Amino acid sequence: ALESQLCFALYSTQLAMNKLYRGLLRELDLTYPQYLTMLVLWQRDRQTVSEIGEQLYLDSATLTPLLKRLEVAALITRQRSRQDERQVEIALTEKGRSLREQAKAIPHAAGCAAQCTPEEAAELRDALHGLRQRLDRQ
């Protein structure tokens, strides 16, 4: 039955999380993938497209249009690497850095909406990371 499938539980939960984040991110004018990209850059500014893609499990064909939209919004800059012309480096603008303050409340708001304690959220996150790592080894 559909309800007994792990893949469906993950899929339907992802849909619900995306809907939740869509509402939370509306005031920041970011999509969920754009928010994840900004999280990566807030953690460490100035990264190549391939470094960002590695962390988000996205290929450059998917990431490039997303980065172009962030550039149009003046949140990032895209520039060819001086060391390697094949690489494009992504850096936050001042506007992109300042958006971090507004975004700080989002994880807490998502946790409240999911009605998870911080411990439950951490346990679930760790279990999902473990599952993904095992699947990546296949």
Give residue spans per PLM region:
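N-terminal leader segment of winged-helix/HTH proteins
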Residues: A1-L28, A122, D126, G130-Q133
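Charged, amphipathic alpha-helical coiled-coil/dimerization segments
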Residues: N18, R46, K68-D126
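Residues that mark the N-terminal boundary/hinge immediately upstream of a DNA-recognition element
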Residues: T31-P33, T48, T93
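Short alpha-helical "packing" element that flanks the helix-turn-helix/winged-helix DNA-binding module
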Residues: T37-M38
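The alpha-helix within a helix-turn-helix
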Residues: G53
